[in-house]
């Protein structure tokens, strides 16, 4: 019989996941129950995708600001260093910054402009043009930024992130100086000790700093890579991919994800006789044309997946074939 339905995506409702839960069993059982209730047949190469958030929650993979601060003090014992290129996000960075500030005496906060790495804008390009500001070469103090652009709030959240981050640091009893620049090496005029908070460009940023005379350089994926006073950790990504859980706690990106996907796949294979692919996913990596935000604040789109999902797409563009 001719196939009339293409790829179908279904959301499977599962129980609330808590720390200590067997995530592999819960996922497999939820999928099997849903398939039975809805009369969904299983086929080889079906894909079960699990959000990273529930995997991390089941692992109890959390860290609080005191634990982050302790790790920061071990990395920057002088207490004076720069925090450069953080993304502008209360969910993604505010609690991390709070922990960083609690472990510091003075922070030089250097923000990229007109936007952060994932497209959250402090200001728009037209404003730069009208003021004659060159983002490729000009380094702005907070005073210069205010004199040029005044108070600018995020279009969706209504937050002035320059003020928000500055106040968050100072409220922790830490001295702060704000700079806006896009060349990471600009920070070396202020300090030789740097915490790189960019995500996808962090390797290059660290290399440029070390080649240019920086003394101590760490990236976010090097913070909280092992347990601190009983905290969670991520040995591969550190604080990258973390999300705000409470005012003083972050949920870290999940770890040991290969074991999780293999366990889920094995349980589904045993129950169905089919080779079902499994992946853990994070941000979708789309770009919003209105807010100009590129939705990829996680270090990777998928921290783990089964072998059948390996490789690059190999597809035919049907509309091109139809026209030719």
Regions found by a protein language model. Name each.
Residues 2-44, 53-324:
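Conserved mixed alpha/beta catalytic, RNA-binding, or beta-rich assembly cores of soluble enzyme
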């Amino acid at each position: 019989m001719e196939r009339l339905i293409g790829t179908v995506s279904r959301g499977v409702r599962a129980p609330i996941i808590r720390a200590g839960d067997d995530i592999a069993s819960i996922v497999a059982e939820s999928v099997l129950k849903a398939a039975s209730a809805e009369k969904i047949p299983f086929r080889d190469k079906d894909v079960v995708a699990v959000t990273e958030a529930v995997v991390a929650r089941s692992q109890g993979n959390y860290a609080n600001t005191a634990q982050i601060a302790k790790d920061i003090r071990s990395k920057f014992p002088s207490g004076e260093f720069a925090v450069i290129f953080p993304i502008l996000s209360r969910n993604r960075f505010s609690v991390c910054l709070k922990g960083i500030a609690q472990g510091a005496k003075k922070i030089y906060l250097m923000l990229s402009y007109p936007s952060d790495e994932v497209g959250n804008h402090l200001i728009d390009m037209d404003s730069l043009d009208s003021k004659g500001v060159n983002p490729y070469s000009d380094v702005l103090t907070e005073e210069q930024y205010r004199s040029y652009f005044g108070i600018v709030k995020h279009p969706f959240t209504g937050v002035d992130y320059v003020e928000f981050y500055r106040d968050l640091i100072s409220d922790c009893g830490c001295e702060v100086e704000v700079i806006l620049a896009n060349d990471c090496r600009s920070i070396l005029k202020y300090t030789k000790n740097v915490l790189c908070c960019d995500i996808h460009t962090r390797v290059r940023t660290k290399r440029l700093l070390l080649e240019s005379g920086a003394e101590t350089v760490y990236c976010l994926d090097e913070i909280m890579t092992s347990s601190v006073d009983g905290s969670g950790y991520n040995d591969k990504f550190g604080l990258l991919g973390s999300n705000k859980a409470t005012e003083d706690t972050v949920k870290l990106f999940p770890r040991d994800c290969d074991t999780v996907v293999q366990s889920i796949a094995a349980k589904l294979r045993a129950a169905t006789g089919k080779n079902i692919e499994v992946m853990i996913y994070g941000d979708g990596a789309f770009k919003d044309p209105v807010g100009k935000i590129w939705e990829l604040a996680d270090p990777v789109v998928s921290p783990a997946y089964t072998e059948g999902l390996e490789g690059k797409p190999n597809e035919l563009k049907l509309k091109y074939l139809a026209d030719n």
